[in-house]
Swiss-Prot record:
Keywords for this protein: Ribonucleoprotein, Ribosomal protein, RNA-binding, rRNA-binding
Gene that encodes the chain: rplX
Name used for this protein in its record: Large ribosomal subunit protein uL24
Family designation: Belongs to the universal ribosomal protein uL24 family.
Gene Ontology molecular function terms on file: rRNA binding; structural constituent of ribosome
Species of origin: Salinispora arenicola (strain CNS-205)
Keyword RNA-binding tagged: yes
Amino acid sequence: MTVKVKKGDTVVVIAGKDKGAKGKVIAAYPRQDKVLVEGVNRVKKHTRISTTQRGAKTGGIVTQEAPIHVSNVMVVDSDGKPTRVGYRIDENGQKVRIARSTGKDL
């Protein structure tokens, strides 16, 4: 499946425990069909406590974002509404992403 959500897109979560949350895509993982969204699907990860060279301790319980499946998010257009993503070829022969609902470029 081709992932139409790219890094830097603003998306809204349409399913799951964070339904309705908006965030920016930090990373996209096309092979797994997942995206990492800022502030969404936060999990607590237990990491080993270690000491740095300066003597500071790092680790413990860390809260971070976990990837979410691309089918559970929709790209937000310039009007702030969720939309599906389509493609068209512009006059220069470049492939451009467009919002299916309005036809505007993303």
